Each structure stands twice: as structure tokens, then as C-alpha cells.
């Protein structure tokens, strides 16, 4: 399965806008958490999302654009297909 991480920037947004974005992204199958190889789940930074599946990068970008557009007219998005990830300082989900 392919793995993707995305980041969304809502321009001139309020905190509530990001809550709405989180809901839209979750409805589209994205998660705000990432699982480590040791089984621990970590919270991603604000407006970063994770998804795995039989997906194409271009399709992931379109879904993210649609979610962002449903919240704000002005936004920036990036979607990356990755083979692995490493991190520091993310908070474990309890």
C-alpha cells in the first residue's frame, strides 16, 4: 500500500476553521495520527494528515484540495508519497 502525508495551510483562518478541516479530512479517510513501528500512535502537527491505501498521489492531492476548499477559498496544500517517516517530539496519543 502507498503511504502519503499531506499538509494544508488555510489562509486567514481561525482555529475553528482547522477543526472543520480535520473533520473534512477524516471523512475523506485521512488521519491526524501516525503509527510507529513500535506500536505507539503519535499526534501529527496541526493540519498534517496521513493516509495509506491503493491511491495515486494526484488523487490524494485532489481529495485534499476539495477538503481545504470546503473550508476556505484560499489555501495551500502539499501531498507527498513516502516510503518511510521518522520524527522527534510528536506527542503519543493516550
What are these regions (language model features)?
Residues 5-9, 50:
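Short glycine-rich or small-residue beta-strand-to-loop segments that form or flank ligand, phosphate
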Residues 9-16:
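Short, surface-exposed ligand-recognition loops at beta-strand->loop->(often short) alpha-helix junctions
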Residues 18-37:
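Short, flexible N-terminal segments of the mature chain
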Residues 66-91:
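C-terminal structural segments of small proteins and small subunits
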Residues 31-73:
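Short, intrinsically disordered low-complexity segments
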Residues 1-4, 13:
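Long, hydrophobic N-terminal alpha-helical segment
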Amino acid at each position: 500500500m502507498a503511504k502519503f502525508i499531506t499538509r494544508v495551510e488555510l489562509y486567514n483562518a481561525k482555529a475553528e476553521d482547522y477543526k472543520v478541516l480535520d473533520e473534512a479530512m477524516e471523512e475523506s479517510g485521512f488521519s491526524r495520527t501516525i503509527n510507529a513501528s513500535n506500536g505507539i500512535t503519535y499526534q501529527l502537527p496541526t493540519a498534517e494528515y496521513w493516509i495509506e491505501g491503493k491511491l495515486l498521489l494526484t488523487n490524494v492531492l485532489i481529495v485534499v484540495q476539495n477538503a481545504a476548499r470546503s473550508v476556505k477559498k484560499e489555501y495551500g496544500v502539499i501531498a507527498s508519497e513516502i516510503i518511510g517517516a521518522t520524527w522527534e517530539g510528536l506527542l503519543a496519543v493516550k
